[in-house]
């Protein structure tokens, strides 16, 4: 009977992850099975007895609709299946969270999983000694994740992972289709942000990295291998005279575009998705080698890996990953050639139906971090009109 029940549990669990069984029916089945014989064996058996005894695991994220989706589609089913509570924390920004991690004792000890901002933070946490080596064989849903999203992490940790890629986006170009045609935007590419006819109607983010990236594209250079920095600085000085506003937040970006104070700007794909959903005539252009980024679920040193593997598997389940994508406006890390993706996600800016992310360029953290002090300081002077 025990073996039969285990097989049934495994089968129902697999169907739930594939989206064939509703969350309600899955939880109902867990309750019946748990009352009959307890949850043991199969994927549930991946959790050792000490792990089952662990009463909780902590997850820190961005809050809001993203955390709500995690709670409904991952944390609640996980707790019902294992008895382990997920402590759901929130943070406002990456630097503040890292300070808290450093201040914990032992460093990182009270923190387990975190929804980090991709490759830069991944490299930073690895460099500080907070990384682990995940056993990929214990995260079955990892097989559905785009390889193109895993490779930047594995390049940092020599072929291993201390995190799983979770979602991605692009800092492309948002433009008002009432004044700029799709054909013109596509023809000009990154150089749209230097179009003379848009003088006084251009915007940009105040971030040094984004502006240098687009100046590199405008001058025909690879952003991770810039050869002529003088050309980049000259392009930014030229653009500075045409920029009406350097925005500092997503809300300000949306306001400038929605109120037609500017007609074109570098823009976060998720914010453009929100503007489009609100009915504003805003297009999104992702030029080749568009500044692309991703977010990951990072596992910190000292975390019970048996528990972490199982929780990550729940979070990568299509039902959960897609719900989070719909909540935050950024596509999931799931490979569309392996997992059915609903239209609500397919229409998001930055979505790639091929799963290959060709033309999506991720910043080389070693290269950019190595130039940060010099380039950020010079950019600040140019932005100020110097």
Residue ranges and their predicted role:
Residues 121-124, 258, 264-281:
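A ligand-binding cleft/hinge motif common to bilobed small-molecule-binding domains
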Residues 64-71, 94-95, 115-258:
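Extracytoplasmic ligand-binding site segments that recognize negatively charged/polar headgroups
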Residues 54-123:
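Early extracytoplasmic/lumenal segment of secretory-pathway proteins
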Residues 19, 25-48:
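N-terminal export signals
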Residues 233-239, 247, 276-301:
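Periplasmic-binding protein-like
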Residues 20, 42-63:
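C-terminal segment of N-terminal export signals and the immediately downstream linker at the start
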Residues 1-25:
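N-terminal secretory signal peptides
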Residues 52-53, 295, 300-363:
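Mature extracytoplasmic/periplasmic domains
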